[in-house]
Amino acid sequence: MKKFTQSIIGSTICNLALAYIVFMLARLIFFFVNYSYFAPYMDSSLAWDMLQGAIRFDTTALLYINGLYILLALFPLHIKEKKGYFLFCKIAYVVLNSIALAGNLIDSVYFQFTGRRSTATVFNEFSNEGNIAGIFLKEFFIHWYLVLIFVVVILATWKIYRTPSVSTRFNKGAYYIKHSITFIIVIGISVIGIRGGIGKAVRPITISNANQYVNRPIETAVVLNTPFSIIRTIGKKAFETPQYMNDEDMKATYSPVHTPSDSTLFTPRNVVVFIMESFGKEYSAWFNRHDHPEEYPGYMPFLDSIAQHSKTYRYSFGNGRKSIDGMPSVLSGIPMFVEPFFLTPASLNKVSSIAGELNNKDYYTAFFHGAPNGSMGFEAFARAAGFKDYYGMTEYKADDDRYKPSDYDGTWAIWDEEFLQFYADKMNTFKEPFMTAVFTASSHHPFVIPQRYNNHFAEGKVPIEKCVSYSDMALRRFFDKAKTQEWYNNTLFVFTADHTNESHHPEYKNELGIFEVPIIFYAPGDSSFSPAYHEDVIAQQIDIMPTVLDYLGYDLPFVSFGSSLFDSDTDKSFAVNYNNGIYQLIKDDYILQFDGKSAVGMYDFKKDRLLKENIIEKVPQQHEMEHFLKAVIQQYMQRMNTDQITIKQ
């Protein structure tokens, strides 16, 4: 046995087995770091299925990652029989597998914010962040235990790695025959492993194949590994137009084109949109007063007080899981399907927004975000979507009478309290009517607040909750100033979150809860605007654009994938989102899950909040919902690929 492990072929097999162990160890760490997302639904049967899937995906990733090492180790040339060459092979092996391990460990933390494994677009998401090195350094200190695990595993890998013994005496003919045959066999096995199987019916496995090993889409993150998810999505076209139905049927079933009636009368009111970083519904007492209110003390008391005098919705959802998903959804009515719109070639399409449409009515429009200009691609999207001006950290710092170095949080942006005061003061200088939007920043990882407030806000059960309370206080201070201004009573205020964040209640950790965000419309100066709490309407972020334009009486056609929440026909309301290769449609009492080919899940979410009872093929609404969702997907993909997300003039 010792002789075999010291041979080139034997040592290579041993080292690949070691790589398998490291991949599986990383998966166990991922599982236990995110234990509360998976444990309530886990049983032995599911665990066995997931293990089978994990081995399949690890095989593909392992062969991708170790391809260079395998080539170096097994290439049939006798001149490689040298200590220096074998040391080079060892270094290549350890470095490549270290990168893979790092990706898996990083995703153990990042998953809590995205609900999925990272894909190739992750490199573009942070490409505009000038402080990315500082952010990573802070994360290393916060998650020191993962850094320690990484170092220990890499040192152990270096120690356990099997280096073949150097052969000085061998028959060259036999050597080349033996090693050539081995090399050809290994190449063949590697091709099969990378594809995920053998046979004409087997297509190269993709992320979506993970769904066959799980009961819930979110569980695919355990089956997958980060290297596979990244490698398999490099260069992949995000939007493929399906042919579920002919165009006539598609348009009759669903159309994102909104055509107001000829009798519509436009009223030029101001519009102010707040995209509150990570303000998930879980942190609200108002939105959780129905079920176990004692478990929801609430960390956004001011926004809750606004909600009581607004039009709000018990069932309201985001259309993505990241900040770069939230902005197109809220302002342009574009949901996130497959990959963030920002990061796809479709981002070069002509795109509109609330601002872009209101420019047609001579509005002044501006977007505000306290991070460095260019951060997250927000400035680029704001300008493409029609905002006339952008106010970021550069503009804030240019105000010498206002700016102090302590106004910067040290990681991401200007503190919300200071920046929202800047926002209010700037709006006081704008000519009416205006439309503005602000994207807050302080309720964000690494979950810190100004030192002067360290003992001011309750800690909560997860670190973000005190940050939500701080940003809520900053919002209250904004309104203390804004309500004294002349423009205030002629303004519609809209509030939502970009996405959800840390959770500690099980109902907010499943495929529905991870998308639950508040949607609030507040018009303090409009006596005809009646506050209402709707329990019969499904609301989503992409409804905000058509709802705002409907409220104003906008009389020009436009494209938005949502619908007006002020439409009296509640049967039209729905929500869509996408995660881990699964499309979701929320309509009436049900949530339908669809993998692009067929329905894989159906739940009565109003009765089954934890989504434990899959009632697929048991309710008559399923097939109508599936047909509707197919029409939405086909419209979306077709319009993205043909640049039809605006009305052509």
Regions inferred by a protein language model and the residue ranges of each:
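Membrane-interface soluble catalytic domains
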Residues: 205-206, 526-649
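Short, hydrophobic/amphipathic alpha-helical patches that form generic packing surfaces
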Residues: 53, 101-104, 228-233, 631-635
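Transmembrane and membrane-interface helices of multi-pass
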Residues: 2-224
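Soluble catalytic regions of membrane-associated enzymes that act on cell-envelope
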Residues: 199-560, 568-573, 579
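Short, motif-level signal for alpha-helix interfacial/capping segments enriched in acidic residues
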Residues: 85, 254-259, 476, 582-587, ...
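Short, function-defining helix-loop hinge/capping sites that tune catalysis or transport
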Residues: 35, 66, 115, 285-286, ...
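Residue-level recognition of alpha-helix termini/interfacial anchor residues
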Residues: 140-144, 423, 453, 617-623
